[in-house]
């Protein structure tokens, strides 16, 4: 199956430069987030906390991991960078938020170069709902490209759900395409109020 992340507000897609707003609920101990870019672009980010603390612009061209400490918000963000991820062949920035202050966090995504070399497109994902203890969502999410692994693999037949009673898409069902433009899901099947 394609998963149930279509309506969970856990995917964001845009071109840089842009600001990504993330709503973090009360009592969240921590969460992870991934930014997947596309070559040949280089990515830089700055993160603003709900209390207004702003990190310096972090440039990842050198491939060095970084940690940000927010003194007033008492939050730590660890950033690990993979310049070229071995399976996908694209840059990946992995962010781990520990003890995040509730409210709206803003991630400013820009190019580390004066002139972008590619199209500047990037995707960000939060964990699937079952991996989060509290709510974390993008304020301007994209319901597209929300298929869960391994349904993105080209050798896998991916099935998503629709509501056969209304002939409409099941809103929670993961949607394609894949991040690199592959056509998924392969099939849709009734997925709402199906008798046992």
Language model feature labels by segment:
Residues 1-196:
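Loop-rich non-cytosolic ectodomains and luminal regions
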């Amino acid at each position: 199956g394609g998963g149930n992340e279509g309506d969970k507000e856990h995917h964001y897609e845009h071109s840089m430069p842009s600001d990504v707003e993330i709503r973090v609920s009360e009592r969240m101990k921590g969460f992870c987030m991934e930014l997947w870019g596309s070559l040949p672009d280089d990515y830089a980010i700055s993160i603003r906390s709900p209390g207004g603390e702003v990190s310096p612009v972090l440039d990842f061209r050198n491939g060095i991991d970084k940690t940000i400490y927010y003194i007033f918000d008492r939050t730590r963000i660890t950033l690990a960078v993979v310049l070229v991820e071995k399976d996908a062949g694209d840059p990946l920035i992995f962010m781990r938020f520990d003890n995040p202050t509730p409210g709206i966090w803003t991630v400013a995504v820009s190019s580390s170069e004066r002139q972008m070399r590619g199209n500047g497109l990037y995707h960000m994902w939060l964990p699937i709902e079952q991996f989060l203890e509290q709510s974390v969502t993008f304020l301007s999410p994209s319901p597209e490209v929300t298929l869960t692994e391994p349904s993105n693999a080209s050798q896998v037949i991916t099935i998503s759900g629709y509501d056969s009673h209304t002939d409409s898409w099941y809103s929670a069902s993961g949607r394609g395409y894949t991040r690199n433009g592959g056509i998924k899901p392969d099939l849709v099947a009734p997925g709402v109020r199906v008798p046992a």
